[in-house]
Each structure stands twice: as C-alpha cells, then as structure tokens.
Amino acid sequence: MTARTDKPHEIVERTLELSRADGCVVIADEHSTANLRWAGNALTTNGVTRGRTLTVIATVDGKEGTASGVVSRSAVTAGELESLVRAAEAAAHGAGPAEDANPLVTGVPESPDFTDAPAETSSAVFTDFAPALGESFARARAGGRELYGFANHELVSTYLATSAGLRLRHDQPNGTLELNAKSPDRTRSAWAGRSTRDFKDVDPAAMDAELARRLGWAERRIELPAGRYETLLPPTAVADLLIYQMWSAAARDAAEGRTVFSRTGGGTRVGERLSELPLTLRSDPHEPGLETAPFVVAHASGDDASVFDNGLPLEATEWIRGGELKHLTATRHSAGLTGLPVTPSIGNLILDGGSDRSLEEMVANTERGLLLTCLWYIREVDPATLLLTGLTRDGVYLVENGEVAGEVNNFRFNESPVDLLGRATEAGRTEKTLPREWSDWFTRAAMPPVRVPDFNMSSVSQGV
C-alpha cells in the first residue's frame, strides 16, 4: 500500500493501535491543490498536486507531570507508521513535563463522514473561471495593459483521532485570486485580490475593470512628503492589520505584561473600550462563506494553541464587542492561569458594526485624503504597543473634493492596529476580502473600509 491508496481513517486508526504512550493524538491532513498562473496576458503554467501530512502527538505520564512529543512527516506510507509513532514517543520521553498538559478532550460526537474518502480539488474548479480570464486578457490587451497573477485552489481534509475516543473530520476549501495590472512601460501598477471557496463567486472581468480605472488614475503623478494624512484603508488593508492584532492577542502574554493588551499594574485590558465606533471583531466557524474547522486542530503547542486541546469544540467568539475588548485567545491552560474563559483561536475573522457605505461612497465624502490599495512587508516594531511598520504598494491615490486627483508616491507607515481602532472616525460596509500580506496563512476574512484621520506615513518609499 502507498500514501495514495491508503484510506486516511485507516491510517489514523492503525497509528493509534501502534501507540504505546499513555495518550496519543493523530492528525492526518490530506491536501490537494490546483493552480493557474499568467503573465503578460497569457497563461504560463497550471498544475494539480496531492499529498498527505501525518502528525503524531504522544503524551507520557510521569511523577513530575505529563510530557508530550510531536513528530510530523509528509507522504507517510503504512510501512512507515511505526517509526513515526516511536519517534513521537521518544520525543515525549526525552522532554520535560509539558506546561500546558491537560487531559485529552473527550465527549465530542464522531463526525458522520469520518470514514469517507478525502475531498479533492482538480482543474475542474476553473471550468467557468478560465474562459472568463481569457476574455479579460483580450480586453486588457486591447486597452494597453498587461495582466499578471495566479489563481490557487486547495482542499484539505483533516482527520483527527485520539486515544481518548475522538474521531473528527473537516474538509476545508480555500481559494485565492490575485490579479495585477501594469502599464506597458511598468511604471504604473495596480492590484486586486479575492478569497473564494470554489471560484464561482469571482469575476475577473470586474477585477480587470477596477484595475483599468486605477491605472487611469495613475496617469497623473503627484509627489507628497511623509506626514500624517486622512487615509481610507480598504478592506484588504484592514484585514492585514487586524489579523496581526489577533495573532498578538494571547491571554497569557497579556496577563504577563508583554503585549498591548496588558493592563498597567497587572492583568489584561479585557473590559476596556478600544474604539468609540460600535465595532465588533469576531470569529465564527460557521460564518457563511467563511466556514472553518469547528474544533481545535493544533499541530504544536504555543502561546495561543495547545496539542492537548485537539478536538475541543469551537464556538462563535466576539473578541471586541461594540468597541469593547471582550476576549483574548486562551487555551485551557492559559485560561486557567489568567482566569479568563477558554477561547481558542478560530480560522476566520470578521469586523462589522460600521455603516452601509461602500468604499466609493466614502471616497465621495472625502475633502482631502489618501486612498490605499494594500499594505506590504508588515513587521512588528514594538509588542508593548503593537506598533507595526510596512509599505504601501500598487497604488496610493490622492482624493480631493470627493474625487481621485491622481496617484502619489508610496510610503512606509508606522501604526498600531489597536491605536487605529481608537482613532478611526468611520467604518463602512463589511465585505469578504483577501489580506495581501498574510494570504499564505490566513484568507477567511470580512472587513469594512475604515477612515483614519491621521494615518502615519513615516517616510517616502520608492517602490511601485
């Protein structure tokens, strides 16, 4: 038997049978991808891949506590299972007691499709999309612009089984589309991205029309110095900032005084008001169009995850409600340390509570300000304030009297997303969006455009 023919549920059952540890968690991730790439108004490559990753988590009880060992391998066959299990057990025996040790999760009903074959994607996912893309190539060519980009679709079937009796399964589709339009001399560039589950809700013609309009705006070039400007952040930029904020919202780190969510004098800022706008930042594994695993899948332990929590059911969670900080990410272990509720990370993020205004309507209501396309190369400067730095990219536009006057130079920015929430004066209509910076790791987001009266453009950037 090979990794291509072994049934995943049989693999995880056989792995559990081989275990000699006091506890065992097995995670099989069956993944398949299909992709298209293009450049200069022509397809360049396409392909389909398939693979498997098997993770074994062994737990060993001792006088001083329970230790854990984690080993992951790709393309594992039935004949290689025992060596994988022994390696995880050896890692557990060689480790000290796990700080986050807890009893393995029990009492979660078995997934009814646990023994079914894994879901798989194929090039058929592009059946309607590819011809529409070809038509966009023709329009772009006639309009004197070049289209570059890629479309990627992934399906991951996760099988999670434990010695405590859990048998869980989740199928996760994930699609991304990134389209970049350039002028023939490459001096003007515009970007648009979309997140999708099946490529049935993306329209390359509409995206190309949007990019053509932006390239037209860029025909007039305006140089501006660094400074603080009223700025309209589109949903993709808001997503990039708030995803990083979520990744920095571990309850334990905050309680220990190490993050922006630490309260001066001790404790956390849970209960404090972060924004005067009635904004709610939330996650929900059952959010329509942004569905994600309804249980914890942890391949390793860290500040915001614990391998002992694998299989723990996930529920809709409000991180910020009506502008007030309500929850930080907490495992069972960190919840016990901080006295906060158990609120594990969830694989999507939604910000709502703004008006029904579109970004275009917000532009029309701007006397003078900047309109961004997206952010890039975001890095943390100071965890205590969550100060981030990064670059604007693929189009920054000056808005005057409700209309785009032209394209300005790019900037480096220095801002904290927490501070931005506090200074924001308007949020518009929430819509699904693709974060540009974090799209390799996090794609399921819905955000509104946000108006900030004094966004800090700290220096001029020479990037396009």
Which role fits each region the language model picked out?
Residues 110, 266-464:
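Dual-mode signal for accessory low-complexity, basic/Gly-rich regions
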Residues 1-306, 321-322, 347, 403, ...:
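Active-site bordering "gate/hinge" segments
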